[in-house]
Amino acid sequence: MTDGHLMFKAAMRSQGQTPAIDISLSVSRVGRQTQDRLTNLLSTKIRQVLSAAADLETVSRFSSELPAETQLILRRKDLITEILKQESLTAIVKQIQVILLALPFTTFLQDKNKTFIEKYKPVIIEAFLKNPALVPITKSVSKLQTDEELIKLLEATKKPHHKFAF
C-alpha cells in the first residue's frame, strides 16, 4: 500500500508545465494531514478553482461571452498554473510558495494574466524576501491560521499609505 501517487503528463510538460503533475489525478492519503491549517485551506481553495475551471473550460469554448464569475475562475486557473511552474533545481521557501498561491485570490492579480506571472514571478519572490515592507508578511505566514488572514494581509499592502504597494 502506498501513501499516494503523482501523475505526470507528457502533454503538460510539452506546454511548459514543470513539474508536469496532473493535480486532478494525483492522490495523497496523508498530504492534507501533514499540512498546517493555512496550507490545507489554501490547497483546498486551489483544488476547487482547478476543478471548477476544468468543468467550465469545455463550456467556455462554445460561448463568446462568459459571465464574470466564469471569467474569474478561468483567469485564476491560468494564474495558479503559471505560479506552479518551477525551474529545475530551484527552491522556493515554503512561506513564499504560500504567498504566491494566495495572490490569485487578491485584487493584486485581478487584472493580471499568466504572462504577468511568467515575467514578474522572480521579482515578486525577491520583493517578499527582501523588501522591508513585505518581509514582515513573509515572516508572519507560519503564524497565520487561515487563507483569509493571509489574503487580508496581502490586500493591506495595496493601501496608498503603505510603503510598498505592489
Residue map of PLM features:
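Conserved catalytic/coupling modules of large nucleotide/cofactor-utilizing molecular machines
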Residues: 1-166
